Regions:
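Structured soluble/peripheral alpha/beta segments that form catalytic or ligand/cofactor-binding pockets
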Residues: 1-308
Length: 308
């Protein structure tokens, strides 16, 4: 791709399915539930390696439980298992219509989820950007938003939910520690959506992302943001104005009501801020995720309020 593509709906449907990976390759699919009506958020996260080793994760936070509730299951999946019916322990994921519809569920001891996702726009594939996906962070990835209908039960308490979901899919090499820092940002109202991924590695900053509104998706060419930390160096305020390749702009304000904390590597720490947003004046939901080198984060957090 030598210029900024606009034909996002033509991204091949085979990439909605499982990929053949090298032994050091990794494939993962994040499904993020944003539930401000309960003060809750969570995710279901299937991942697998080229070796066949796989993991399913479920994680939720909310005011009804004092600590983040997490469950996971590790195992080995068959080489011929597809995303039409991917199963591991308590997790099942089924891509029922490529790049459009997904069923996903978790039946654990504390967490039980059954959800149906339907996309509201075409997938944004990083390969459609002239510089593609940074190769240390995968061969490719797609980002997509959609509507979700879910029944969620945590510790026996029911949380029926109709809302909006953030979903991403990545495959290929994944060397978490190379990024010194990244910002993985999403916002959606259902009618409009925005995403950007700003990665800082090897002294360079890479930006990928899209703006979707009025039925048109375009690459982002600029993001201008401000944010503020709390005393634990968790992002609590975030505002951004984005500009796309057609010169369109959107302004989004994030009211971060809670943070999911996770890590997939001892060198990194991931703080996923879950938010209500105002997107060009319309209500929506979003994600404001900051990833840090763990040594830097552990050192710098004592100074975040004063200097950050």
């Amino acid at each position: 791709v030598s210029e900024l593509a606009t034909n996002f709906e033509e991204f091949p449907v085979e990439h909605a399915h499982r990929h053949r990976l090298a032994e050091n390759g990794r494939e993962s699919l994040a499904h993020i539930f944003l539930m401000p009506e309960y003060g809750m958020a969570g995710f279901l996260y299937p991942s697998m390696l080229g070796t066949g080793d796989a993991r399913g994760m479920a994680c939720f936070f909310g005011p009804s439980f004092p600590q983040q509730v997490e469950e996971s299951h590790n195992g080995v999946i068959a080489e011929d298992m597809t995303f039409a019916d991917w199963r591991l322990g308590p997790m099942r994921m089924a891509v029922t219509e490529p790049h459009k519809k997904v069923s996903i569920s978790w039946v654990g001891e504390r967490i039980k989820v059954a959800a149906e996702f339907e996309a509201t726009h075409p997938p944004y594939a990083f390969s459609m950007h002239p510089r593609g996906n940074p190769p240390y962070f995968g061969d490719n990835r797609t980002e997509q938003h959609g509507r979700v209908s879910a029944t969620i039960e945590i510790d026996g308490k029911s949380f029926p939910h109709e809302g909006l979901m953030i979903r991403d899919h990545s495959w290929g090499p994944r060397i978490w520690g190379i990024n010194q820092h990244y910002k993985w940002i999403h916002a959606t109202t259902g009618e409009a959506s925005m995403h950007f991924f700003e990665m800082q590695a090897f002294g360079k900053t890479e930006l990928r992302g899209f703006l979707f509104k009025e039925g048109k998706m375009r690459h982002l060419v600029d993001v201008d943001y401000t944010f503020a930390f709390d005393e634990a160096m968790l992002q609590r305020e975030f505002r951004v104005t984005v500009t796309d390749s057609d010169g369109r702009q959107s302004s989004i304000e994030y009211d971060i009501y809670g943070t999911l904390q996770s890590s997939h590597d001892p060198k990194t720490v991931i703080n996923t801020g879950c938010a209500k947003v105002r997107f060009d004046g319309a209500d929506g939901v979003g994600v404001c995720e900051f990833n840090w080198n763990r040594n830097y984060f552990d050192f710098a957090k004592d100074y975040a309020v004063r200097y950050g």
